[in-house]
Amino acid sequence: MSQVHIHPVPADYKKQTLMDRETYDRWYSQSINDPGTFWAERAEQLLDWKTPWDTVSEWDFNEGRAAWFKGATLNACYNCVDRHLPERANQTAIIWEGDEPDQDKHISYQQLFEEVSKFGNVLKNRGVKKGDRVVIYMPMIPEAAYAMLACARIGAIHSVVFGGFSPEALKDRILNAEACALITADEGVRGGKTIPLKVNADKALDGIDCVHTCLTVKRTGGDVDWQAPRDVWYHEAMADASSDCEPEWVEAEDPLFTLYTSGSTGKPKGVVHTTAGYLLNTALTHKYVFDYQDGDIYWCTADVGWITGHSYIVYGPLANGATTLMFEGVPTYPDASRCWQVVDKHKVNIFYTAPTAIRALMGLGDAPVEQTSRASLKLLGTVGEPINPEAWEWYYRVVGDSRCPIVDTWWQTETGAIMIAPLPGAVDLKAGSATLPMFGVQPGLMDPDGNELDGAASGNLVLKASWPSQIRTVYGDHQRLIDTYFSAYKGCYFTGDGARRDEDGYYWITGRVDDVLNVSGHRLGTAEIESALVLHPSISEAAVVGYQHDVKGQGIYAYVSLMAGKEGSEELVKALRDLVTQEIGPIAKPDLIHFAPGLPKTRSGKIMRRILRKIAADELDSLGDTSTLADPSVVDQLIDNRQNK
């Protein structure tokens, strides 16, 4: 392994941070040895409760069950908005930076309270009640956050669907969630282009009976079809709504939201997060991982359609009374300096983005960064996938001027909040390492036979004890939760990731070990992409694997077998990419398509994906044993025609 570059925390920086190493060690030890006391103290410190809990936690990983703060009642919206009004009514809660550099808004906590309260009444006036599911299919505009908080206020369960998903993908999620309402916009705007959200929503709703309301925000004023009485303009409904909307006090374990994530079986799974544990852990991690202090301007570049947007644009920051920035655009529009121009414009102190964005910006050179000041920055973060040390060093040296610590955070949709990360004032940084576990997190490394590995080792990453923001179930299919996360290693949660632990106890995430790709920080199931490809009448079979991509982290490599009499062509490549875009969305479009005369299969008919991964990676000297294949000659043909030479 190449030499690891260690970056000690500067002494003057340590003095200003919320947590030093001694405090981290003490808190972490208590969180493992006396979790009841630890989490009770954090719950009192960070959240407001209507009624107290009976028990802090009870869990059984064999059954995939966990409950935190049972007996307590609270409201997530109240904790994110109302309780801040006495001291923060005039403080900016959300800075919105539009796609064009001359568009921005500052929304105070008082304004946020009024908008969300009205929005809650709009939903109630349309018959949405506690426990109902509401799908949100929105661009990155303040109304997306209002919608989430309004649902939480009235006890409805939101399910945000990323605006880049296709009508078919949206339809699947609406049906699975059994939603009664959809909140969307006429169009989204991103990188100077419009996204036809209402058109997509109309296609998705075609033939669906459960949705009685489609509330539409006017973002661009573009032409849209209208279906009364289902369709309602947001601005018209809000004009008549009262701002008096009492929060619905819910049980600690009542669901806050469902968020769909890719699985290895091809059918997206609805990850259910509940109110108290999720809100507590997002508040805790936002405060200490980002060393958030009063007055800081915090910017997470994620989309609210992903878990990072839920936890670290909306719930975590607002629970802490922070100022959070929402960005509608992309890092390279109108030019490659945009991110750093936004940092200077709004005096951003904390910047949290994905390695994919860092690598893309690194590829455009230092000049777009260096023509800006960035003097306000004090902390940088990364999320979504492992960051390679070269990109880490560039981010540290060029973006942060070698003075801003980087928090490389590992977590998942299912974990709800950051699980492994360095605390900026407490530990020395190693480029590319996610570092140390957060409070209450007990990681373990397992070998393929299920034996736990001690000391410095590499293996499959598991979590050995429950944590407050843990996934509670897969919506409508608890058995799938058990099969996916709690069956591989008895009594442990299996993350699906591989990891290495070094001699200092630092963790290094090595990537997925299951059939899920991590493309630009977005999880995509290979089976879902394969299912889309074989819809084409020329394709008999498809197998999708990941390969190393300089910008995206992982690229999508699709092997496709043709029907008899069909031939591969550039036209067919385009048609297949368009088909995947239509079925899932542009993020799932294959980078490389390899027309294969056959796929390597065992005699029982199982595709040997290990071999396909090796060929896609151009690692031809480590294919391993191919003698068990039904037709070993297929491998030579695949090698000769490989797309990633």
UniProtKB/Swiss-Prot annotation:
Single annotated GO MF: ATP binding
GO cellular component, one term: cytosol
InterPro entries xref list: Ac_CoA_lig, ACAS_N, AMP-bd_C, AMP-bd_C_sf, AMP-dep_synth/lig_dom, ANL_N_sf
Residues holding Mg(2+): V534, H536, I539
Biological process, per Gene Ontology: acetyl-CoA biosynthetic process from acetate
Catalytic activity: acetate + ATP + CoA = acetyl-CoA + AMP + diphosphate
CDD domains assigned to the protein according to its UniProt record, in alphabetical order: ACS (cd05966)
Pfam families tied to this protein: ACAS_N, AMP-binding, AMP-binding_C
Modification after translation (UniProt): Acetylated. Deacetylation by the SIR2-homolog deacetylase activates the enzyme.
Cofactor(s) annotated in UniProt: Mg(2+)
Keyword Membrane: no
Enzyme class per UniProt: ligase
Keywords: Acetylation, ATP-binding, Ligase, Magnesium, Metal-binding, Nucleotide-binding
Similarity comment: family membership: Belongs to the ATP-dependent AMP-binding enzyme family.
Function: Catalyzes the conversion of acetate into acetyl-CoA (AcCoA), an essential intermediate at the junction of anabolic and catabolic pathways. AcsA undergoes a two-step reaction. In the first half reaction, AcsA combines acetate with ATP to form acetyl-adenylate (AcAMP) intermediate. In the second half reaction, it can then transfer the acetyl group from AcAMP to the sulfhydryl group of CoA, forming the product AcCoA.
Protein's name according to its UniProt entry: Acetyl-coenzyme A synthetase
Organism this protein belongs to: Alcanivorax borkumensis (strain ATCC 700651 / DSM 11573 / NCIMB 13689 / SK2)
Encoding gene (name): acsA
